[in-house]
């Protein structure tokens, strides 16, 4: 029986958004609370990776551990966050979530889990023609690859994927709803996302 863990990349202050996205309000709670509610119901263990500037605030909203990046790789982007989560929780597979996709559904994690198998290092969805490496699943064997990249100061998710045996899944092929992946980067997108969802 594989153990599944979740890693939420909460980041810190968002310059484009003007405030920490993790704490933006969403349907009566916050982005991070909504994401965690979904993840904790689908996965065995979840950890939040947060920037030191908002860690204490995030802790007030959540019931799961909130940690910072491994000191040596602090601030090295999503790869540092992912490997920090992998070090904190021992698991076979890790489902990754950014904190700015507040509309994710528990169903998504069920789909993702079903798509994993031993021969793959990662399962990455393609939504509306775009790869989504931060809404993906990674096997724990990827940890060593991430360390090797960070040591060479390579920080892009694309560089990691190029070294992995990746199973790409098109959202429409697995009945994944594109709305689950709505990604909020600016206040305009935030207003739009709230509008779109209240119209459903």
Curated annotation (Swiss-Prot):
EC identifiers of the protein: 2.7.7.77
Keyword entries, A-Z: Cytoplasm, GTP-binding, Magnesium, Metal-binding, Molybdenum cofactor biosynthesis, Nucleotide-binding, Transferase
InterPro entries documented for this protein: MobA-like_NTP_Trfase (IPR025877), Molybde_CF_guanTrfase (IPR013482), Nucleotide-diphossugar_trans (IPR029044)
Residues involved in Mg(2+) binding: 100
GO biological process, one term: Mo-molybdopterin cofactor biosynthetic process
Cofactors demanded by this protein: Mg(2+)
UniProt enzyme class: transferase
Main location group: cytoplasm
GO cellular component: cytoplasm
Binding site for GTP: 9-11, 21, 69, 100
Subcellular location(s) per record: Cytoplasm
Key word Repeat present: no
Catalytic activity line of the entry: Mo-molybdopterin + GTP + H(+) = Mo-molybdopterin guanine dinucleotide + diphosphate
GO molecular function: GTP binding; metal ion binding; molybdenum cofactor guanylyltransferase activity
Domain remark text: The N-terminal domain determines nucleotide recognition and specific binding, while the C-terminal domain determines the specific binding to the target protein.
Function, as annotated: Transfers a GMP moiety from GTP to Mo-molybdopterin (Mo-MPT) cofactor (Moco or molybdenum cofactor) to form Mo-molybdopterin guanine dinucleotide (Mo-MGD) cofactor.
Family: Belongs to the MobA family.
Name of the protein described by the UniProt record: Probable molybdenum cofactor guanylyltransferase
Organism of derivation: Bacillus cereus (strain ATCC 10987 / NRS 248)
């Amino acid at each position: 029986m594989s153990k599944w863990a979740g890693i939420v990349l909460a980041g810190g202050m968002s310059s484009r958004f003007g405030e920490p996205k993790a704490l933006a309000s969403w349907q009566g709670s916050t982005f991070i609370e909504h994401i965690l509610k979904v993840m904790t119901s689908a996965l065995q263990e979840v950890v939040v990776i947060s920037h030191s500037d908002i860690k204490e605030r995030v802790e007030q909203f959540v019931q799961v551990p909130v940690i910072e990046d491994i000191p040596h790789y602090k601030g090295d982007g999503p790869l540092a966050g992912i490997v920090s989560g992998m070090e904190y929780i021992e698991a076979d597979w890790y489902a990754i979530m950014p904190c700015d996709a507040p509309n994710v559904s528990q169903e998504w994690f069920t789909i993702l889990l079903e798509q994993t198998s031993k021969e793959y290092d990662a399962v990455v969805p393609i939504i509306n023609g775009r790869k989504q490496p931060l809404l993906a699943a990674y096997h724990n064997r990827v940890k060593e690859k991430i360390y090797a990249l960070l040591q060479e100061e390579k920080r892009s998710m694309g560089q990691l994927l190029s070294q992995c045996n990746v199973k790409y899944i098109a959202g429409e092929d697995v009945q994944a709803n594109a709305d689950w992946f709505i990604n909020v980067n600016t206040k305009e997108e935030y207003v739009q996302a709230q509008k779109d969802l209240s119209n459903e």
